[in-house]
Design a protein with these regions (language model features):
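Rossmann-fold NAD(P) dinucleotide-binding segment
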Residues: 1-44
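Catalytic cores of large soluble enzymes that bind and process phosphate-bearing ligands
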Residues: 6, 10, 84, 127, ...
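Short, basic, helix/turn surface patches
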Residues: 12-21, 134, 174-179
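A broad, structural surface signal
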Residues: 16, 20, 133, 137, ...
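Rossmann-fold dinucleotide-binding core
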Residues: 29-121
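Active-site-proximal catalytic alpha-helix in oxidoreductases
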Residues: 86-141, 147-165
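NAD(P)-dependent Rossmann-like dehydrogenase/reductase catalytic/cofactor-binding core
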Residues: 141-256
Length: 256
């Protein structure tokens, strides 16, 4: 079994070296469906006489490793792209159990890759930064201090509310907050939904068409990609909102 756990860009660069070792009866294991789903763009086309399988943990590699060492695990999706040996399912589930998956749900390489890229650009990372920044900016533009704007936008969300609705659901959250917050949340969730859904639809179509994959391939293949990435991350890190975060984190009770 050959495990391909490299970044999407790296898979493309090492594929010519890897492919000769994929002899009949072996298995090629992925943790993400990108390379196979957009094989017309990545050039990753496995031989037909091997198993091609995937277990995709629903979280970061850092979280997966930390939880594994603690005897816990992330939930994972799994998929079989090719079953040349008749053992692909057994191999896949064994790996899923071996990495400590809380539970395993079946998918396809295409569905995993499409939902993953949508999530990363949407609610998991891209959209959440956009939403937080928009609210922070409006509060600051209306005279609120950096500390107040950050606490009401980010700190309360991440330190207090997220753990609660992660454990109990959003209905529980709404049932266990102040009546003022409850009424406002119920009234405003629909305008936010209606404003955001067209953006998510546009994003999904960009992912499904392969456009997002191509953007990723093109940008990651540039020789100065890392340099430009560091510049973008530096700008984010040095923005007022995230500089305020540094101060606020230092003031948490556990840090004093």
């Amino acid at each position: 079994i050959i495990m391909c756990l490299l970044s999407d860009a790296a898979v493309m660069s090492v594929w010519p070296t890897m492919k000769p070792f994929l002899t009949p009866g072996k298995a090629l294991y992925f943790s993400h469906g990108f390379a196979i789903t957009w094989s017309d763009r990545t050039g990753v086309v496995p031989p037909t006489d091997i198993d091609v399988i995937m277990v995709a943990p629903k979280g970061s590699g850092t979280s997966l490793r930390t939880m594994f060492l603690e005897g816990r695990g992330l939930n994972s999706s799994y998929a079989i792209y090719q079953d040349a040996t008749g053992k692909a399912l057994d191999r896949t589930l064994a790996f899923g159990i071996g990495i400590g998956s809380g539970y395993l749900f079946e998918t396809t390489f295409q569905r995993e890759a499409t939902s993953n890229l949508t999530g990363e650009r949407g609610s998991l990372m891209g959209a959440i930064q956009g939403l937080l920044l928009a609210q922070y900016e409006v509060l600051r533009e209306n005279g609120h201090t950096p500390s107040e704007a950050f606490n009401e936008t980010v700190e309360e969300l991440t330190q207090s509310l997220m753990p609660l609705f992660a454990k109990n659901g959003m209905d529980w959250m709404y049932a266990n907050c102040s009546t003022t917050a409850q009424r406002g949340a119920l009234d405003w969730m629909t305008p936010f939904h209606d404003a955001i859904k067209p953006v998510v639809q546009k994003l999904y179509q960009s992912v499904k068409s392969g456009n997002e994959a191509q953007i990723s391939i093109d940008s990651n293949s540039k020789p100065d990609y890392r340099e430009k990435l560091n510049e973008e991350l530096k700008a984010l890190r040095e923005s007022e909102m995230w500089q305020t975060a540094v101060t606020v984190r230092k003031l948490r009770p556990e840090n004093n």
